UniProtKB/Swiss-Prot annotation:
Keyword hit for Disulfide bond: no
Organism per entry: Oryza sativa subsp. japonica (Rice)
Single Gene Ontology BP annotation: mRNA splicing, via spliceosome
Domain Helicase C-terminal: 408-568
InterPro entries in UniProt: DEAD/DEAH_box_helicase_dom, DEADc_DDX41, Helicase_ATP-bd, Helicase_C-like, P-loop_NTPase, RNA_helicase_DEAD_Q_motif, Znf_CCHC, Znf_CCHC_sf
Protein's name according to its UniProt entry: DEAD-box ATP-dependent RNA helicase 35A
Region described as Disordered: 1-23, 40-85
Motif (DEAD box): 345-348
Domain of life: Eukaryota
Length: 627
């Protein structure tokens, strides 16, 4: 027992001596790096001298040799410390990877940043119904229609079709694009519709109609982009009438059924105008013995009972604003079981004005595949990417740059002080004979100018969102019929409304978004006529807005006033950026004076979203925020 007790201290001492033999001294990081540098220096000294300095530099950039195995001493001949230092650190590896990676220029960094922003902005829920999203339903082929172009168009060589598109300045993007049609007779429209076109003075199709009508008639989904006054309305109205006519002739509609096709507009005035265009073609068809086609104007501010009476009889075509349409569908007064044709007119404005959620709710009521068309004069890249999610093999037809100003409009920009605008407005009214359109940002300015003009004896009317529907309709009717000389309006009248005789548009103030400016001046210079647009600017406008205006004037080859020419322009030479990124100007709002990284519209929407989230978190007001 004593022997065993005596042996245990001896065993412990032997174990301690073994641990001391295997013990490796801890070497601090700084010392390991110094040892590594010393080892590399000795390696370089042991090699023969390089022939030139450039070769020495190249050799210094090479990675260090792999470390020796654990049981093999390092090149320095040291102990365990050098063995530990042979493995390169993460910092050394990162430096080597940075040296090996290709150098990225500042322009390439900006392009990558913009691309990430656009992908993030376009990464929204797709424009599909809840049923399609839930069941994972996707459509790979577009809808088939009974329409075919004439044989000579079907046999047209592709080279000739491309030559015609170049001649008409038409850009197309898509697979299996139908050939362009230079004559309305090639579209195989009924004779009463062709006769009505001739009565309206429309003899030859415009560029957007040359390519757009064959695309839509063949059943393809389409994004149509063309400057204001180019005839986009006929591109989706004529095929819609043909769809309704074909469905009625195959199987007549029964009470409570329909519609077969639908057009959604951002404003009541634009919806009413589109509805009137449809009726102009339906009247001669009915007189010629074709089946009756019943359209429905579905807008707010009008008694719903009259609209429900049309629905009960059975409706073929619906022209609507999102709010009233959503209301009818939610109350199950109308269904979209048979709807196969959908057009979003001024599609980018529908999204920007906050109708995106309403449109999604409308999409939820579709029961089958439909042909979807999107049209606008200003269609930024982010809207195009977002819209493609709802389309099946879409064809993009572009006449000119999206967001470009109409070249038939002479743009004049005047620097006018805030308090001198109303007096200078009277002088500008003398430039051209009536009718004249005056635009303002605020409803209060519209009412003020309207009263001032009436006091000066000018026959004027006014419209804005604060007036009831009857006042708005009467104002536009009096102005179109020539009973009133001047129409004062907010941007509610700037999108899509057609006033064919207007020679002069006056912007009492410069809109904050360049898209609204393009829509405003597009009310004149329509159908090939020349018009004048006068814009008042002053120190209240932001520099970004003025730079966008400057680039727009330069693109349209218009005179640039000295106050704009003197602005410091960071994008004066952005040709390289535009060529490498494929996007000219801002991809979010379409402005040419800034890039998407500096877009004021995007910043404004971000701040609005943050304010909305705070309001949701802290409550909507009332006592202690409970309301």
């Amino acid at each position: 027992m004593a022997a065993a007790t005596a042996s245990s201290p001896a065993t412990a001492a032997a174990a301690n001596s073994d641990d001391e033999d295997n013990y490796e001294e801890y070497i601090p990081v700084a010392k390991r790096r110094a040892m590594e540098a010393d080892r590399l220096r000795r390696l370089r000294l042991s090699k023969p001298a390089p022939p030139s300095s450039s070769a020495a530099e190249a050799a210094s950039d090479l990675p260090p040799p792999p470390p020796p195995p654990p049981n093999q001493p390092s090149a320095g001949g040291g102990g365990g410390g050098l063995e530990a230092s042979a493995k390169p650190s993460l910092l050394v590896k990162a430096t080597q990877l940075k040296r090996a990676a290709p150098e990225v220029t500042h322009t390439e960094q900006l392009i990558m940043q913009e691309k990430e922003m656009i992908e993030h902005l376009s990464d929204r829920k797709t424009l599909m119904s809840v049923r399609e999203l839930a069941k994972g339903i996707t459509y790979s082929d577009p809808l088939k229609t009974g329409w075919k172009p004439p044989l000579r168009l079907r046999r047209m060589p592709r080279a000739k079709a491309d030559e015609l598109r170049r001649k008409w300045h038409i850009l197309v993007d898509g697979d299996d694009v139908p050939p362009p049609a230079r004559d309305f007779r090639d579209l195989r429209l009924p004779e009463p519709m062709l006769r009505k076109l001739r009565e309206k003075g429309i003899v030859q199709p415009t560029p957007i109609q040359v390519q757009g009508l064959p695309v839509v008639l063949s059943g393809r989904d389409m994004i149509g982009i063309a400057f204001t006054g180019s005839g986009k309305t006929l591109v989706f109205v004529l095929p819609l009438i043909m769809v309704a006519l074909q469905e009625e002739m195959m199987m007549p509609i029964v009470p409570g059924e329909g519609p077969f096709g639908m057009i959604i507009c951002p404003s009541r005035e634009l919806a009413k105008q589109t509805y009137d265009v449809i009726e102009q073609f339906l009247v001669p068809l009915k007189e010629a013995g074709y089946p009756e086609i019943r359209p429905l104007l579905c807008i707010g501010g009008v008694d719903m009972r009259a609209q429900l009476d049309v629905v009960k009889k059975g409706v073929h075509i619906v022209v609507a604003t999102p709010g009233r349409l959503k209301d009818l569908l939610a109350k199950k007064k109308m269904n979209l079981d048979n709807c196969r044709y959908l057009t979003l007119d001024e599609a980018d404005r529908l999204v920007d004005l906050g109708f995106e959620d309403d449109i999604r709710e409308v999409f939820d009521h579709f029961k089958a595949q439909r042909q979807t068309l999107l049209f606008s004069a200003t269609m930024p890249k982010k809207i195009q990417n977002f819209a493609k999610s709802a389309l099946v093999k879409p064809v993009i037809v572009n006449v000119g740059r999206a967001g470009a100003a109409n070249l038939d409009v002479i743009q004049e920009v005047e620097y006018v002080k805030e308090d001198a605008r109303i007096i200078y407005l009277l002088e500008c009214l003398q430039k051209t004979p009536p009718p004249v359109l005056v635009f303002c940002e605020n409803k209060a300015d519209v009412d003020y100018i309207h009263e001032y003009l009436l006091l000066k004896g000018v026959e004027a009317v006014a419209i804005h969102g604060g007036k009831d529907q009857e006042e708005r309709e009467n104002a536009i009717e009096f102005f179109k019929n020539g009973k009133k000389d001047v129409l004062v309006a907010t941007d509610v009248a700037s999108k899509g409304l057609d006033f064919p005789d207007i020679q002069h548009v006056i912007n009492y103030d410069m809109p904050a978004e360049i898209e609204n400016y393009v829509h405003r001046i597009g009310r004149t210079g329509r159908c090939g006529k020349t018009g004048i647009a006068t814009t008042f600017i002053n120190k209240n406008q932001t520099e970004t807005t003025l730079l966008d205006l400057k680039h727009l004037l330069k693109e349209a080859k218009q005179r640039i006033p000295p106050v704009l020419a003197e602005l410091n322009d960071p994008l004066e030479d952005e040709e390289t950026m535009a060529k490498e990124s494929g996007v000219k100007g801002c991809a979010y709002c379409g402005g040419l004076g800034h890039r998407v990284t500096d877009c004021p519209k995007l910043e404004h929407q971000k701040s609005m979203a943050i304010a909305g989230s705070r309001r949701d978190y802290y409550g909507g007001g009332g006592y202690r925020g409970e309301i």
